Amino acid sequence: MKSSRTRRIRVPRQAGFTLAEIAIVLVIVAFLLGGMMSMFSAQTDQRKWNDTQSQLQAARDAVLGFTVANGRLPCPANSTSAGAEVRVVATGVCGAVGNAQDYYGGVVGGVTYGLLPAVTIGYQPVDSQGFALDAWGNRLRYAIARVTTPSTGTPSANFTYASNMKTNGISYLPNDLVVCASATGISAGPPGSCGAVATNSVTNQKTVVAIILSPGKNGVGQTAPGTDEIQNGNTAGANNPVFISHTPTPTGATNGEFDDQVLWISVGTLYSTLIAAGLLP
């Protein structure tokens, strides 16, 4: 009788990853994920930038629509007005008791600067307090020319007073708001000036009647704003009609980080809109 023998079947071993190989794979995955996150973040920022630009344009259209309906530009809102303009009805002067309002409080003379009066002009959407926000959740800001040339005529308000606008006509030009390419060499005024270097002037003092501005992704009140963004911030009590507008720059740029988005209404656009509506001869 033959004895049976147990036959052993060899199973080939499956090759596994060594610790070094796993580490390499993890590094590659982390690199790819980091690149994807960076790309996603950049795409998100670009989308929000585009959305904000559209919001600024819509706000501009709403301001001009209000102007056609009322024969004047709206005054700025302030941080306590729930999105309504702050204006002395009898004189057309922007601000309570004749003082201009800005984001941080009152400004006497110069430019009437504050927040977009979204409720007054019928702009949507607004937040629960009545303020228009950019795509990053910052309140849209709004400045308007106060000083004119010639400077005669009473009451003093022109662009925010329908009766004066009609009486003075298109011969009256703004003489304070100015947009510059850099804060270097500027003079606050009023009237404001971009300085002696001609290429620093984006507009002159007789061009801009209103400015609508988003403080961008880094918002208002950042810990270390660049000099260009400081200029657009106009801290409490500043009597400063100069604004800066240029392409975004990083923190290491000469005048620091800048991501504000600035849009303005020219006096030519204002007058042509009113003429087309039959409100000016």
What are these model-derived regions, one by one?
Residues A42-P281:
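N-terminal pilin/flagellin-like segments and related low-complexity appendage regions
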